[in-house]
Amino acid sequence: MKLTIFAATGGIGRHLVGQAIAAGHDVTAVARNPASLPAEVRAVRADLATAQPAALATAVGGADAVLSALGPRSKAEYGIASTGTRAIAGAMQVAGVRRVVVVSAAPVGAVASPRRPRPPKHDPGDGFVMRHLLSPLVNAALRDLYADLALMEDILADSGLDWTAVRPPRLTNKAETGAYRTAYGRNLRRGLTVSRADVAHLMLAVLGQPETIGQTVGIAN
């Protein structure tokens, strides 16, 4: 399969690239600073904070699917998920590429957005501790980040593309296990963490699962 991976040098992106190569995929890897990418990929330099769809056309052209691990590395980059995803979606529409899988976050199901101005107060998969203790603290601290990710999901839902958004909880650097749990449209009870490597594994796996199109997918170890 021909894959284009955005944010290919980030925490999840590095795992996506490595696992895709190991699985025998033909990989185009897009990054702001692509010097550290492995020799097996076709490297493309792009800054998704400012990129226009036309500038990404060569990166997505001919791809069977696009995977994006785009997200901010600091508060100064809040907004990059929606901005970059809008450019990626536009490039895909021009190139005639339909399948896209992105990384979102577990709290986004309860975050308001233009498309969902009145979301549920709690994600249906969250238990008591998450609903009443952890979520209020995390959501308050990272409100702008989650609003950006919610807008990103709106952009995909309105794009006409065959999208899937993976919503992990707190990310860790543990090894890939493949033993994670998943759920459509909700989070996982007692699902507090998941490794970046397992998120990458799921993102590649859903490419062969057409039932995930138009879905958010919760994941946790």
Where are these regions (language model features)?
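N-terminal Rossmann-fold cofactor-binding loop
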Residues: 30-35
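N-terminal Rossmann NAD(P)H-binding glycine-rich loop of SDR-like oxidoreductase domains
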Residues: 3-25
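Conserved Rossmann-fold cofactor-binding substructure of NAD(P)-dependent oxidoreductases
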Residues: 42-64
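N-terminal Rossmann-like NAD(P) cofactor-binding module of classical short-chain dehydrogenase/reductase
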Residues: 60, 64-67, 77, 101
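Substrate-positioning beta->alpha
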Residues: 80, 84-85, 148, 166, ...
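Conserved beta-loop-beta element that borders a ligand/cofactor-binding pocket
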Residues: 153-174
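NAD(P)-cofactor binding segment of oxidoreductase domains
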Residues: 73-102, 108, 151
